[in-house]
Amino acid sequence: KNINIEPLDHSKYQNIIKKQKNKETFANLASLLQCFEIGKEKGQDLVFFIEDDYLHFEPMLEEMIASYERIASQISKDIFMCPADYPYLYMNNEKTNILIGNKRHWRTINKSLCTFLTTKNLLDKYWDNFYQTCLDRHDPFEKYLNEIYKNEICISPLKSLSLHLTNINSSYGLS
């Protein structure tokens, strides 16, 4: 298959994204918004948004697609999936459901970062949330994405398929 690399024109987003404290934050928001726009314009079925600071284990994509097919068909509903089992999701004693995927179990979560797989249908349905995520630096950054999970199912694997290599010491991953 052909792979298209889409250049990022920051000027396209100058009047859309609120002025930020630094260029890096603006660039991150612009890049994310362009990714969401490409998914909305060109996505057909499943859409996978992947940040550049993750290490993915070899079975990740196969396991996610097979588990998506199994779980979404069992519950007759489109879902969101994260490839990482984030440490920060264990900070609160929140109830979760365990689902059987292809070769591992998955648990329901109510927060994610910006690396996730979903459907074009859910991207369209919650476009305002995706768009709002990119207009300013929110606290948490994924505030509007996390609002979606009040109505939709988001899951992460029990035994992570990816490792988030963040540049800070935090519960979001390893530094």
Q: What is the meaning of each model-derived region?
A:
Residues 1-44:
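Active-site-proximal specificity loops/subdomain of glycosyltransferases
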Residues 2-7, 80, 154-156:
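Conserved beta-strand scaffold positions in the cores of enzyme catalytic domains, especially
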Residues 10-14, 25, 53-55, 86-89, ...:
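Short, solvent-exposed loop/turn segments at secondary-structure junctions
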Residues 17-23, 95-101, 170-174:
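Short, surface-exposed amphipathic charged segments that create phosphate/polyanion-binding patches used
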Residues 25-33, 110-114, 120, 135-146:
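Conserved glycosyltransferase catalytic-site signature
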Residues 46, 55-129:
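Conserved catalytic core of nucleotide-sugar-dependent glycosyltransferases
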Residues 120-121, 125-175:
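C-terminal catalytic/acceptor-binding lobe
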